[in-house]
């Protein structure tokens, strides 16, 4: 079976078994967590600038804690801009946000991440999902 194949090919790997829904949820949740982390550190960067502090000094001190992984703490990001860009983070934050709304579950944190990101970037990568109801397409 498939599990035996992966065990044979990757004997040292930890293999997790889950449903496709659980797997897709994990991928989306991780990307949304990283997007929130990027947004949080960008806001700390702006605060440091307003206080006349060196963000990188403070970030490096924070990272000595070892509870905070340094990934996604560089500001500006790899594209030289504030907040998150690329394809996956904007797509996944919007998709999960819309899904949370349809499920009528709490979504204020993710909503704030998306809203604040959109204030920092005007690049239209954070796709707005619009209802096509009553519209001619």
What is the predicted function of each stretch?
Residues 4, 49-137:
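NAD(P)-dependent Rossmann-like dehydrogenase/reductase catalytic/cofactor-binding core
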Residues 1-71, 99-103:
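Internal alpha-helical scaffold of NAD(P)-dependent oxidoreductase catalytic cores
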């Amino acid at each position: 079976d498939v599990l035996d194949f992966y065990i044979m090919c990757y004997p040292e790997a930890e293999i997790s078994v889950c449903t496709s829904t659980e797997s897709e949820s994990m991928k989306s949740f991780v990307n949304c967590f990283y997007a929130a982390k990027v947004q949080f550190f960008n806001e700390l960067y702006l605060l440091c600038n307003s206080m006349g502090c060196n963000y990188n000094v403070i970030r490096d001190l924070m990272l000595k804690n070892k509870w905070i992984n340094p990934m996604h703490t560089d500001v500006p990001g790899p594209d030289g801009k504030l907040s998150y860009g690329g394809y996956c983070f904007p797509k996944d934050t919007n998709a999960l946000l819309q899904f949370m709304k349809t499920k009528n579950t709490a979504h204020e944190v993710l909503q704030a991440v998306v809203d604040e990101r959109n204030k920092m970037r005007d690049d239209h990568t954070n796709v707005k999902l619009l209802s096509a109801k009553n519209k001619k397409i």
